[in-house]
Amino acid sequence: MSITAERRTALISEYKQSETDTGSPEVQVAILSERIVNLTEHLKTHKKDFHSRRGLLMMVGQRRSLLDYLKRKDQARYQSLIERLGLRR
């Protein structure tokens, strides 16, 4: 369900804005998206795992908030991120 340290490092290096960037909205959204995909796969096999489903909904809400923030602050970065991640919006 969780992502490995190597995968997290790869996501950070792919979406970072500067050399020391680990907490920009782009990086946070990329990590959350990876966790959401993993948890969705888990829930496909464990349909009655409602505790994990609640965690999934919280992660989706957090990602939505970060995307809304990024859209408000910098429309170009927002568009670039959703295209790179393949999100619907």
Swiss-Prot record:
Pfam families from the UniProt entry: Ribosomal_S15
Biological processes annotated in GO: translation
Secretion signal span: none
Superkingdom assignment: Bacteria
GO cellular component: cytosolic small ribosomal subunit
GO MF entries: rRNA binding; structural constituent of ribosome
Keyword Lipoprotein: no
Function: One of the primary rRNA binding proteins, it binds directly to 16S rRNA where it helps nucleate assembly of the platform of the 30S subunit by binding and bridging several RNA helices of the 16S rRNA.
UniProt cross-references to HAMAP family, sorted A to Z: Ribosomal_uS15_B
Subunit structure: Part of the 30S ribosomal subunit. Forms a bridge to the 50S subunit in the 70S ribosome, contacting the 23S rRNA.
Alphabetized PANTHER family for the sequence: RIBOSOMAL PROTEIN S15, BACTERIAL AND ORGANELLAR, SMALL RIBOSOMAL SUBUNIT PROTEIN US15M
Family, similarity comment: Belongs to the universal ribosomal protein uS15 family.
Protein name: Small ribosomal subunit protein uS15
Annotated organism of origin: Gluconobacter oxydans (strain 621H)
